């Protein structure tokens, strides 16, 4: 993302293209596999409307997308979002403006259906269906694994976090504890998770 308000209109396209080139260069550097491995896997498809948008968007363009077409999985992903590089002030401002998208005040039945559909997709793609023995299993992907636990917490957070800001924890363990405290999770299940 870049903050288009910092640049005069007459150089906007030039600035936008520079940010796109820079984003591509950074992506290549951190994804490149060397003898030591790679820095970090990034997937530029995980951005607003990836088939038609550039890899680096203006803040206003991104906000417009999320306000009009953002999906439940994107809301869940932004629960954990934080600024980590670049213009931290602009990044924080973007995340603050995004809060109404993430945390809706009213119960969102479409989000509940989306969550159910995502869960079914995860189950269908589960490569390790037998979790009875953890030996040799991918603890992230098995049923009841890390992804399931995160998904459980984020789904509850999306459903109720717009009306109860105590549920807006970005760390999964903290979120589970708050969900238990607020009655969304039984304490014995908290211990198991």
Where do the model's predicted regions map?
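A nucleotide- and high-energy phosphate-metabolite-utilizing enzyme signature
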Residues: 1-193
């Amino acid at each position: 993302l870049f903050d288009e308000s910092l640049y005069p209109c007459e150089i906007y396209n030039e600035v936008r293209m520079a940010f796109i080139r820079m984003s591509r260069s950074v992506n290549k550097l951190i994804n490149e596999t060397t003898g030591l491995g790679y820095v970090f896997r990034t997937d530029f498809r995980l951005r607003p409307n990836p088939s038609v948008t550039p890899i680096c968007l203006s803040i206003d363009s991104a906000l417009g997308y999320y306000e009009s077409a953002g999906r439940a999985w994107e809301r869940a992903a932004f629960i954990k979002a934080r600024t980590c590089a670049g213009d931290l002030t602009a990044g924080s401002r973007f995340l603050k403006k995004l809060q109404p998208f993430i945390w809706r005040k009213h119960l969102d039945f479409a989000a509940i259906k989306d969550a159910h559909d995502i869960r079914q997709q995860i189950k269908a793609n589960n490569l390790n269906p037998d979790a009875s023995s953890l030996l040799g299993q991918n603890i992230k992907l098995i049923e009841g694994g890390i992804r399931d636990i995160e998904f459980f917490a984020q789904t509850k957070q999306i459903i109720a976090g717009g009306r109860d800001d105590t549920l807006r924890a970005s760390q999964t363990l903290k979120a589970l504890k708050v969900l238990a405290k607020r009655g969304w999770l039984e304490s014995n299940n908290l211990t198991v998770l």
